[in-house]
Amino acid sequence: MATELTWHDVLADEKQQPYFINTLHTVAGERQSGITVYPPQKDVFNAFRFTELGDVKVVILGQDPYHGPGQAHGLAFSVRPGIAPPPSLVNMYKELEASIPGFVRPAHGYLESWARQGVLLLNTVLTVRAGQAHSHASLGWETFTDKVISLINQHREGVVFLLWGSHAQKKGAIIDPQRHHILKAPHPSPLSAHRGFFGCNHFALTNQWLEQHGEKTIDWTPVLPAESE
């Protein structure tokens, strides 16, 4: 049963913590000094904007945002309309083609339609310097996103967690497998997808789990906002 609690309810105290204020201050300082930081400030918390706590059915964990121009917009693995899908997302599409009947790979990589169905697309680090992967990994974001995972664990039941790669799988320690459904596989990156991401069947297994527990399944075909109106 969906909780009435919102992200605002459960995160208000966390956002007053000194570490969190310091994280925001550091990121703001870099932007003000002329360093390009992705995603743009208005998009940093989009994962929470598009998927409210009470609507979370699935969590897909990423690591840090894409660090190329115009890509990152606050949803893990997703890119803005007009930007070519990056290699990891292309491999996710390949797995969807292989496991979801009727899935046709789109030309875009914008996953907002997943988020609006209850798929929380959460990077564990929410900002990055342009061209420098993991450049904000030690700023405190992971303390915050670990708290987010623990709050989902606490306030929701029957959430499917898709943990791809060793970084995401370490977060499994925060999740109670008696309350939630955890699926693990290698990361969809070209470096590791052939080691077991392809063939993991996670998208189909997620829908199977949701259906068995009386939840609406996810339409995994990403739809651009204009197409869904």
Swiss-Prot record:
The gene is ung. Its EC number is 3.2.2.27. It catalyses: Hydrolyzes single-stranded DNA or mismatched double-stranded DNA and polynucleotides, releasing free uracil. The active site is at 64 (proton acceptor). Belongs to the uracil-DNA glycosylase (UDG) superfamily. UNG family. GO terms for molecular function: uracil DNA N-glycosylase activity. Monomer. PANTHER family: URACIL-DNA GLYCOSYLASE. It comes from Salmonella typhimurium (strain LT2 / SGSC1412 / ATCC 700720). This is Uracil-DNA glycosylase. GO terms for cellular component: cytoplasm.
